[in-house]
Amino acid sequence: MTILFLFLLLFLLMFIGVPIAVSLGLSGALTILLFSPDSVRSLAIKLFETSEHYTLLAIPFFLLSGAFMTTGGVARRLIDFANACVGHIRGGLAIAAVLACMLFAALSGSSPATVEAVGSIAIAGMVRSGYPQAFGAGIVCNAGTLGILIPPSIVMVVYAAATETSVGKLFIAGVVPGLLLGLILMVVIYIVARVKKLPAMPRVSLREWLASARKALWGLLLMVIILGGIYSGAFTPTEAAAVAAVYSAFVALFVYRDMRLSECPKVLLESGKLTIMLMFIIANAMLFAHVLTTEQIPQSIASWVTELGLSPWMFLLVVNIVLLIAGNFMEPSAIILILAPIFFPIAMELGIDPIHLGIIMVVNMEIGLITPPVGLNLFVTSAVTGMPLGATIRAALPWLMILLVFLIIVTYIPAVSLALPNWLGMS
């Protein structure tokens, strides 16, 4: 009865247009008040405790790092470097946009931030060179999803907090899938470009390439600092996020000098707004997940699945279907916090590696970011290009097929996710 009330109230609130964070918190709070012996005071304590997780402290720092990198002109230098690397290939500007998304993803940890930073520059450049705007918009919208797959990733941090999994292992596990997806997108773009006879830029000289690499070097070093520092044990993922924020501010203010000190309060305010919004969603989602755990729903479902005799591949198929449906209607962090505690014990029972499950969930969240009606990347791409939302959706959907094929690869070839952590002795 309790769990039926919880989900019916959640779907009712979402159906009438209540924001997802409020829907999660209100349904969880009312369920506790009506069906739990806990007092109103304990509800406030629980809401605070759910957002007090040490791992989640990485989120505001990664958001701040991305804000400094975007405002400080790092994205423009990364795009110039990507163009210098692959711009001479047929369809090179589009391939360079994917490469730039991969590079910026390794700095920001956020998919919408990647789309905004790269798309605002790369799409306009493609249009000026004769590419169809819809073609460029579709590519950047999809390639921007790499922001949550290539480490550092805010969604991975949330999964780690929900399942008590190592953030460092998740970050390392995301490297190969992120590179593989980027490579697949580049190959498909090249094939399409050959068919459509899209233009290529003149090949740059070695001197020009070295100049672009030198300008982008300070941004590229951040990837080495984050992953190298975590793997070497120099600092934890949360400490790495803090180091990234300080480093990004230093580069933007004193190395590239694209920012003035007077602009810092604005950057801090914008990243603070994003942090508050995301943490509000996370706190309410964790309250909702607390109700699920209190009612022992994950344990009940795990027992039921075990009795059904589902094989691991069948279970993962069900996981993907549920996540793909949820991704159409909910924000990634909320989905992770609600469903990860349910899927996690079942996966452990079936012998599925928790890191592998985490990468599968992240790839599903990537797809959710580009599927209507609430795919955030679609709205960001529409705002960046000035295209109507419907046109943006039509531009992005053909490339969605690539992500679905990639999801199958990641789901049923665990080595894609686990080979690098195992090779580094992190298994």
Name what the model sees in each region.
Residues 1-427:
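Alpha-helical transmembrane segments of multi-pass membrane transport proteins
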